[in-house]
Amino acid sequence: MKIGIVGAMAQEVEILKNLMADRTETRVASAVIFEGKINGKDIALLQSGIGKVAAAIGTTALLQLAKPDCVINTGSAGGVAKGLKVGDIVISDETRYHDADVTAFGYEKGQLPANPAAFLSDKKLADLAQEMAEKQGQSVKRGLICSGDSFINSEDKIAQIQADFPNVMGVEMEATAIAQVCYAFNVPFVVVRAISDGGDGKASMSFEEFLPLAAKQSSALVLGMIDRLS
């Protein structure tokens, strides 16, 4: 089995990249794909760049060139569900766009034509992620992760997203685009993100301060998953 891993920023993939043996590097547009082995497992690690378009370009290149059997999206997210704190893990059962609106033509909020309203994560991958998080003693929640091309940093923005998607756990800028590409290629995926901020007025300062912690937490969980996948 070859495991695909996607992170947007260098900080989000650095730990995993540095653990890779026999590492090679391929650049496609703004994306970088690192291939090698971690703990004897074949890994294709994508640093996609930030935002939905960069994520889609990179994930398409990853799936076409490296041909992984599954994809794990790792990194950080803003926590908007009650009880979430910095360092906690959110695992996707589904992902949706919070900034897509074709409701004028009868689609659900967040749904794009010719696509489902929600992209469902692979249950086995999500179950494994939860099992590993609990085994590592990490605080974890599962549910809806919403994506959009905005860094959410105000209570008003959170309130609007929660009004449209009451069950949202976390918000970020790539996961649903990655999920859409995986859906199109029929490749199972899951999103595993660590909370770096609360999406409120202090989000930008919190993000800068706690991104290293979020990267460490999410990378530790992904490493646990790698050891179990075969």
Curated annotation (Swiss-Prot):
Which residues constitute the signal peptide according to the record?
none
Which InterPro entries would you find in this protein's record?
MTA_SAH_Nsdase, Nucleoside_phosphorylase_d, Nucleoside_phosphorylase_sf
Does the keyword Amino-acid biosynthesis feature in the UniProt annotation?
A: yes
Binding-site positions, substrate:
78, 152, 173-174
Q: Reaction catalysed? A: S-adenosyl-L-homocysteine + H2O = S-(5-deoxy-D-ribos-5-yl)-L-homocysteine + adenine; S-methyl-5'-thioadenosine + H2O = 5-(methylsulfanyl)-D-ribose + adenine; 5'-deoxyadenosine + H2O = 5-deoxy-D-ribose + adenine
Q: What is its EC number?
A: 3.2.2.9
The kind of enzyme this is, by top-level EC class, is hydrolase
Any single GO BP term: L-methionine salvage from methylthioadenosine
Q: Name one GO molecular function term.
A: methylthioadenosine nucleosidase activity
Query: Could you tell me which CDD domains the record lists for this protein?
Result: MTAN
Task: State the SUPFAM superfamilies in the record.
Answer: Purine and uridine phosphorylases
Catalytic residue list: 12, 197
Name the source's superkingdom. Bacteria
Recorded GO cellular component terms are:
cytosol
> What pathway is this protein a component of?
Amino-acid biosynthesis; L-methionine biosynthesis via salvage pathway; S-methyl-5-thio-alpha-D-ribose 1-phosphate from S-methyl-5'-thioadenosine (hydrolase route): step 1/2
Sorted UniProt keywords: Amino-acid biosynthesis, Hydrolase, Methionine biosynthesis
Q: Which family does it belong to?
A: Belongs to the PNP/UDP phosphorylase family. MtnN subfamily.
NCBIfam families in alphabetical order: MTA_SAH-Nsdase, PRK05584.1
This molecule's function is given as: Catalyzes the irreversible cleavage of the glycosidic bond in both 5'-methylthioadenosine (MTA) and S-adenosylhomocysteine (SAH/AdoHcy) to adenine and the corresponding thioribose, 5'-methylthioribose and S-ribosylhomocysteine, respectively. Also cleaves 5'-deoxyadenosine, a toxic by-product of radical S-adenosylmethionine (SAM) enzymes, into 5-deoxyribose and adenine.
This chain belongs to which protein, by name?
A: 5'-methylthioadenosine/S-adenosylhomocysteine nucleosidase
Source organism: Haemophilus influenzae (strain 86-028NP)
Q: What gene is this protein translated from? A: mtnN
